[in-house]
């Protein structure tokens, strides 16, 4: 099992089973790994902005993260606009970006760039995985970050040698519950504020706009005579 296969296995273990891709040569080992796992659905997109926009839309509909695969810094740059939108919408995405092999970066090839610097403004979490032995752990951390409520952009940078060198099976990796529960005290504060208001108004956003939650909010609004 190479590093790329280790990462795909980790994604599946973390219930990330869709990858919207626009790869290049640096990502071929990961592309091959995607094809080896039947449970992983790999969707080729003809433009990076399509891949990142599709991942955003997937989260908004399914409320669970998908992954993306982009080619180096320029490929990431082409997908920035929809990563920006996804971050503003609190969509969870595991954003995988290929990188040159670590010992090749110093040669400053035409597509060499500061991928971490490009990714940081549109990501909640950014990490370059520098060893094929660590990619499963780094991938699990990316999934964990993407699942933090209500959703986050986790950018994992995958150098070529991290992908092709021998990796580890993600057997011992565990995923913790990353949901943020609202305390009873905050709920009570909200109730008291609604009771005290002369013309109460409830403003909602994010996951509160899902149908099941809007039904609950409508009942609260009716009970409290809210707008």
Residue ranges and their predicted role:
Residues 1-227:
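N-terminal alpha/beta PP-like core and its mobile active-site loop of ThDP/TPP-dependent enzymes
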């Amino acid at each position: 099992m190479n590093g790329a296969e280790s990462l795909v296995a980790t994604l599946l273990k973390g219930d990330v089973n869709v990858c919207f891709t626009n790869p290049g040569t640096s990502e071929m080992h990961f592309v091959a790994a995607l094809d080896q796992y039947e449970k992983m659905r790999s969707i080729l997109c003809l433009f990076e902005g399509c891949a990142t926009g599709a991942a955003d839309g997937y989260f908004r509909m399914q409320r669970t993260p998908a992954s993306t695969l982009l080619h180096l810094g320029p490929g990431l740059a082409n997908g920035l606009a929809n990563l920006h939108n996804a971050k503003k919408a609190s969509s969870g995405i595991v954003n995988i970006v290929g990188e040159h092999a670590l010992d090749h970066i110093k040669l400053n090839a035409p597509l060499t760039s500061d991928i971490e610097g490009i990714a940081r403004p549109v990501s909640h979490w950014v990490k370059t995985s520098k060893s094929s032995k660590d990619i499963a752990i780094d991938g699990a951390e990316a999934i964990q970050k993407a699942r933090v409520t209500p959703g986050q952009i986790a950018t994992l940078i995958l150098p070529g040698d991290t992908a092709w060198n021998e990796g580890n099976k993600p057997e011992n990796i565990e995923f913790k519950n990353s949901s943020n529960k609202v305390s009873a005290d905050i709920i009570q504060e909200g109730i008291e504020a609604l009771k005290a208001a002369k013309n109460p108004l409830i403003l909602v956003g994010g996951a509160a706009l899902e149908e099941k939650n809007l039904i609950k909010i409508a009942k609260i609004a009716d009970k409290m005579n809210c707008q």
